[in-house]
Structure formats: C-alpha cells, structure tokens
Amino acid sequence: MCGIFAYMNYRVPKTRKEIFETLIRGLQRLEYRGYDSAGVAIDGNNHEVKERHIHLVKKRGKVKALDEELYKQDSMDLKVEFETHFGIAHTRWATHGVPNAVNSHPQRSDKDNEFVVIHNGIITNYKDLRKFLESKGYEFESETDTETIAKLIKYVFDNRETEDITFSTLVERVIQQLEGAFALVFKSIHYPGEAVATRRGSPLLIGVRSKYKLSTEQIPVLYPTCNIENVKNICKTRMKRLDSSTCLHAVGDKAVEFFFASDASAIIEHTNRVIFLEDDDIAAVADGKLSIHRVKRSATDDPSRAIQTLQMELQQIMKGNFSAFMQKEIFEQPESVFNTMRGRVNFETNTVLLGGLKDHLKEIRRCRRLIVIGCGTSYHAAVATRQVLEELTELPVMVELASDFLDRNTPVFRDDVCFFISQSGETADTLLALRYCKDRGALTVGITNTVGSSISRETDCGVHINAGPEIGVASTKAYTSQFISLVMFGLMMSEDRISLQNRRQEIIRGLRSLPELIKEVLSLDEKIHDLALELYTQRSLLVMGRGYNYATCLEGALKIKEITYMHSEGILAGELKHGPLALVDKQMPVIMVIMKDPCFAKCQNALQQVTARQGRPIILCSKDDTESSKFAYKTIELPHTVDCLQGILSVIPLQLLSFHLAVLRGYDVDFPRNLAKSVTVE
C-alpha cells in the first residue's frame, strides 16, 4: 500500500540536490500506492564518526508537499557532493496511526536517528514487541507498527556481542522476530554508505546501473550459521564474512548505482536491469557490492537471484496529452486488449494458445471444478466471465471474494483448479487465498499484470494479461484485459469440443473486432461528458442489469464510488422487486444496461417497473434497440458484439462517466481519498 524508494550511488559523485531529485521522482512514480504523507532520509553534513548524522524530512500530504519542504531546509547545503551516499524515501498510506509527520516514514530508532527504516506492510505482533522494548527503556513517539522495527534493530545493536557485527546480520536477527507482511529498507549512521533491504509478503526489487561490466548475472544466496528462536536471544549469532565472489559489483571496484523500489515503475527511468527479491531475502550493499542472504534454507530454494531485464518503457508510465492516468488508460484499451490477445489468438485457424498454461493443460482438463478468486475489480472480471466459462468448460465455476473465501475456510480439493486474479500480483487477501489453496493440493493459476509479482511466482502456472503499466488507482484497462484472458482460457479449454465449435468461432470473431468497437465506444466521450453535467450534483446513483452485464453494473458502480465519492450501487435487475425498487423515484438517477442478449426480455420487465415508479432511466443499449429507447430518459447507444463480450463495451461508458463526474466534482481522479493502487495488507 505504501511506496518504497531508495537510491545508492557508489563512486558516482552526486550533489545533495541531485539525490533529492532522484528520490522525489521515485516517490512520484509510486504515489499511486499511497499519498497520505511522505518522507526522506539522507546523510547530514558531518562525516566524522562521532558526528555522523542522518537528516529526516517528513511531511503530511502528497509528494509535492515534501518536495517543497526539502528546499526550505536551511541546515542542508544542496550543493555539497557525495561520491558515495545512500538515501531512502517513502510515500505512505496509513494503516497504523493518522497521517501526520510523526507517523510518516522513515521511522527512527531514537532522537539521534541511529537507525531509520521505511516499511510497506503490516507487522501483526508489533504490540508484543513494543511492550518488550518499552520494558527495556525504549521510548516511542509514533502510533505506527514500523517504529517498533527501528527500535528493535537499535536494541540488537546495543546488545551486540562483538563490535564488528554486520548490518545485514542485525536485520537478519530483527526479521526473525517479525510477524505479518513487510518490505523494509534500512539506513544507519553506524554503517555509512551501506544499505540493507528485505521483504516478506510485500514486493521489493532492486535495479542496478553501471557503465562498467558487472561481476555476475546470478547472485548466489548466502545462509546464516544458525537460527534465532526468540527475541531474548537475538544477540547471539554470527554471519559468515563475505568475499567478492558472492556479490554483485562493478568489476574493478568501479562506479555502480542501486535503486530499491516497491515496483518497477520507479526504476525504469534509471535502468531496466533488476533483481526481484523473494520472501525472506535480505539484500545488503556495502562498498558497492550487493549480496543476498536468507534466514532459513529449504529444499525448494533457488540457489541464486538472476538479474532480469524489464520489458517496459518510460513513456508507458507518463500521462502524455491526457489530464490523468485514468483517462489515458481508458483510451488505451483498444491497444491493451489487442496486446492481451496478441500471439495467443489465431484468427485464421480459430485457435487459442496460452503459453503459460500449456504444460498444465491436461491436468486442468481433468479437474472437477474451477474456483476464480479476486478482490474488487478483479473479482468483477471473474463475475463477468463466469457464465461463458461454465458454457465453454462445462464445469462448475465458483467465483469468490478472497477475503470471504478465507473467512469461510472454504473446502478445496486436489482436483480443483484455482485462479487468482490481481493486477499488481501482490493483493494480500488474494495471495493468502493462493497459499490456502496450495496447502490443500489444488492446481493454482495466476492472472496478473506484473512480471515477477508474488502471485506470478507462487502459482503453478499463469497468464500475464499484457495490459501495460496501470498507474491510476481506479482500474480500467486491467479489467478488460482480465476479462479477455479468462475468455481465452475458456476458448482454449473447449478447442476439442465439437458441439461448441460454432459458439467458439462466434466468440473469436467477436474478439477480432473488439479493438475497433472499443474505439467506437470511446468516440461517445463528449456525449458522456454532457450526461455527467446533469448528474454530478447528485448524491446517489443506481446501476442495474442482469446476465452478462451484471458484472458491468458492479464494476461501473465501483468506479463511480471510488473516484466521485457518490453513493452508487450495482443491482442485479432480477432482484429489483426484492428491495431496491423502494429507492426508485423521479429524483434517483438510474442507469440500466440493456443489451440484445438472452436476458433482453427480462431487462425490459425491469425497465417497465422503473418507469412505472416515475424513474427516469438512462439506458446503455444496442444501436438498433428502438424498444428500450422509447422508455428512456436518455440513451447511450453502443455497437453490438457477441453476448459474452458485450460487457467489455458496456463498461467503458461507465468508466468515462466516473472520470467526468470526478473532474466536475473537483476531485483528483488518480488519487481517490483513502485508497491505494496495490493493496498489500489485509
């Protein structure tokens, strides 16, 4: 939920101003992950051992407020140059403690800032740790769980058994006492020019840049000599010493830069060479050399971490000519849905091949049940495709909200196939559901938009939706690409079903025409803006439909409430008489999605009920639908496609409507209050 960014320059001279600029740009790339408050920690002016100082600057509000605050710091000389320096930065989405400067990160160990730490995640046992530390005389100043980590590493350091204990050993001892999810980056006055980072359940990657040859492409993983059982004994173990053969560095001890971040969008402008850390990895940089340690060894551990090349371009994470990332991403959907299908759907032979699933296809076809699990928009993509998946696979399909799935301890069997949908691949509840299903022997399939994410690594197989980076907090293009990915799975599963060939060909023809039809829908933007002008002063809104378009209503209502803060509700039209009809009157805006599909006649019944109660329905309908338009207050006519894909076309007007409503109401579309893009805590 929070954004972590850190930058180390080793033998690369940088002024403090240049370091600030790098840190701030990194935070701005991560601001969609949280924007309650932000902070940085950099070296002070003194380099003498007894006078070393870490300067903290923290500010409530967005990164821009922090940027302005940095240049008000009279005590810092922006022109001073550092040949080697390590700076850390953080943008926060509050989970413990209100958004203010004291609760912002970096959190510190004491008033002298001996150790500072930035954190993404939640420490579930922080109260016990805090109680222990308070009993040892450590004083706390914030309400955060993160401050416990800073105080704990200070405790380990204060009680060290030897003066030459390494920074990574301290961190190793600390994380064995932590329960919950975390990505952490540490800085200390006792280890100048050194960095230590670690993760468990929250994402963290390291970018490396050097104009010189690197020592290796595979960094070996190192292990400690023993494990620590409890917090009272954490000062009694040793880490073995390192040598250059176990580290990544520029050959000849030359200049090198390291970038630590929660995701790749903050790194790509600097380098496309990255290392994805695994859970419980501890990455340490000292003297320009990166080493990776692990707390425990298991038989399934990969013995090394490879440097990978990001397939991303900087322009993909820039707004271009659009006023907001969300608007840009809505208008990117003709390209994003094409990219999702590219190389997978052969329109000449009517075949579909998902390379990430091909090795497990026989096992998937033998399954007895499909379980599709997600949260928010990803859950809606599952709802949208449930009917066509049942039709094409001829299997029962359960669609589950990850949190509810876990709360119920849902029975899962070895002959189930479980899908986990997440744009970021890091959604905490979905990740926990994945581990729950793996423990019960089910085959697990990930559907994500992020290479190297936790879900993509931990599932048995998966589909990368190839939608491109999505920065706007309100998901748009990821939804339509997830939708198509699930449809493609159904098509692949039904390839040898003779009775379904005509239906398959109809759907594949629909997929082929989809990018052009989306462009046609996007051309209605001005008309939708005019509709928003009529609606933006309203306090509540109903969106109703049924069949294939029920998910459209859920997703449209979610988009409206996410970024406009209007109350909106997605209603199954078949449930209208069972309560929601009581809300309908001439003041209540009602949007109805009525398409020429098998539910058309039933939707007409719902329309009659709404108009009979003096409702003024705004209808999304097919171009040739004269019947619905007779009863409509307003209509938005959409091109027609095959019924199971119509939801892709009908959701786009609701995405546009939510965008225009938010702008007219004066809200920041890309940064809705209380929300973050990547939900990495429960």
UniProtKB/Swiss-Prot annotation:
Q: Which one GO biological process term can you cite for this protein?
A: UDP-N-acetylglucosamine biosynthetic process
Keyword Repressor found: no
Q: Which reaction does it catalyse?
A: D-fructose 6-phosphate + L-glutamine = D-glucosamine 6-phosphate + L-glutamate
Extract the Pfam families matched here: GATase_6 (PF13522), SIS (PF01380)
Phosphoprotein listed as a keyword? yes
- What highest taxon heads this organism's lineage? Eukaryota
Give the Phosphoserine positions (modified residues).
Answer: S244
The protein's UniProt keywords, in alphabetical order, are: Aminotransferase, Glutamine amidotransferase, Phosphoprotein, Repeat, Transferase
Per the record, the pathway is:
Nucleotide-sugar biosynthesis; UDP-N-acetyl-alpha-D-glucosamine biosynthesis; alpha-D-glucosamine 6-phosphate from D-fructose 6-phosphate: step 1/1
Record-annotated SIS domain positions = 360-499, 531-672
Q: What is its EC number?
A: 2.6.1.16
Which residues are listed for substrate binding in this entry? T377, S378, S422, Q423, S424, T427, H578
Q: Which residues form the Glutamine amidotransferase type-2 domain?
A: 2-288
Any idea which GO molecular function terms this record carries?
carbohydrate derivative binding; glutamine-fructose-6-phosphate transaminase (isomerizing) activity
Tell me the function of this protein: Controls the flux of glucose into the hexosamine pathway. Most likely involved in regulating the availability of precursors for N- and O-linked glycosylation of proteins.
Cross-referenced NCBIfam families: glmS, PRK00331.1
Protein known as: Glutamine--fructose-6-phosphate aminotransferase [isomerizing] 2
Taxonomic classification, please?
Eukaryota, Metazoa, Chordata, Craniata, Vertebrata
Task: Report the gene name.
Answer: Gfpt2
